[in-house]
Amino acid sequence: MATEYALRMGDGKRVFLAREKIMEEIEAGTANAADLGEIPALSADEMNKLAEILMMPGKAVSVEHGMEIPVTHDIGTIRLDGDQGNSGVGIPSSRLVGCMMHERAFGADTMELGHIDYSFKPVKPVVANECQAMEVCQQNMIIPLFYGAMPNMGLYYTPDGPFENPGDLMKAFKIQEAWDSMEHAAEHLTRDTIWIMQKLFASGADGVNFDTTAAAGDGDFYGTLHAIEALRKEFPEMYIEAGMAGEMVLGMHGNLQYDGVTLAGLWPHQQAPLVAKAGANVFGPVVNTNTSKTSPWNLARAVTFIKEAVKVSSLPCHVDMGMGVGGIPMLETPPIDAVTRASKAMVEIAGVDGIOIGVGDPLGMPISHIMASGMTGMRAAGDLVARMQFSKNMKIKEAKEYVAKKLNVEIRDLADEYIMRELREELNIGVITSVPGSAKGIAAKMNIEKLLGIKINSCELFRKQTGK
């Protein structure tokens, strides 16, 4: 009897498959992506490697030494203090505690602050509160800290917003009116996002994470691209990550263009050049998980799409890998076996420059991804590599080479806790455990500025406030 391997369905349910069936599923998944995206399927060697990853005997797997990548985040501290019946675990804690827990306890390379609603529009009335929270976090933290939110253009339609719902208008065959409503909503989305980030950047934010971009279709993508363009023009040093909502941009409008390209129907490898053109530093491509398909099918399909996006993108690609995307099951407590296998496959086969950790409980998301493929932040040199990706648009190989040269170490040493612990203390760039008298917060980041030859926004704010 053929050996069967314990894998997952797209909803997280356990399923047992023989190697022959696993290969059939991988071939079908990569063929589906190749057909839809008109891109190359995985090679025979890549499919065999993916099968080997899926069939590894351990519950958790990880990338090979030296292949670690930085991680970014979606939903910020909500996975800790959130309690809405989704993936939040309802721990009563401040956002400062949540951010520092990711930095000091989870080994995150970057982190983000976000509003409990996690959309830009609701931030407007409480932006002063968000600015104060950002300042306090920046004074205490060392890793890059973004402000994260969803463009969420749907909030601009009735009953939540001022413009009539285009879905209702279309049902009434008022097509032009529906188009007008989407265009007006996109303009307001752009305006609000710029205004909010002007305030947050003035309060020391390293940058912005546009999460779930294009959730409301091509109008949402259109408004976000124009917001990125305006922010880049006003703030050349701002870190900007653009993470998508789905694998294909839905044509809710159908006629909107950016840089002469129609936005409706774009796949990840077609979205990447537009995100770069707008002025982002990092692109977060997405591939949806099909809950009725197996993990070999879903992961092969996701890796195929993302591999092509990485290939054509001039920007570093941090693939979005929360529950329900990136080959990961759609489950609030994502299975560790599935998460770590998807994480390893994206790094070793798709060649991603980083991973955007999405929705899921703390153990199933940040802890699993960081254990599988992360650089472990301040435990090693993950925060430094991430800063070079966002400061200079460096892909993973270039960023690692740059940081290794500055530290006078081998590339493989960048994720070595033993080597980096002593080196970080010697250079006074912040250590993960408490050392009396060592640089912390702004002081450590000022030393990182000198080491890497970059500017850090919270340090610029400190100098402005002190006149030094």
Swiss-Prot record:
EC category name: transferase
GO biological process assignments: methanogenesis; methylation
Record's keyword terms, sorted: Methanogenesis, Methyltransferase, Pyrrolysine, Transferase
Pathway membership, UniProt: One-carbon metabolism; methanogenesis from dimethylamine
Record-listed E.C. numbers: 2.1.1.249
Catalytic reaction list: Co(I)-[dimethylamine-specific corrinoid protein] + dimethylamine + H(+) = methyl-Co(III)-[dimethylamine-specific corrinoid protein] + methylamine
GO molecular function, one term: dimethylamine methyltransferase activity
Similarity-based family: Belongs to the dimethylamine methyltransferase family.
Function description: Catalyzes the transfer of a methyl group from dimethylamine to the corrinoid cofactor of MtbC.
UniProt name for this protein: Dimethylamine methyltransferase MtbB1
Organism name: Methanosarcina mazei (strain ATCC BAA-159 / DSM 3647 / Goe1 / Go1 / JCM 11833 / OCM 88) (Methanosarcina frisia)
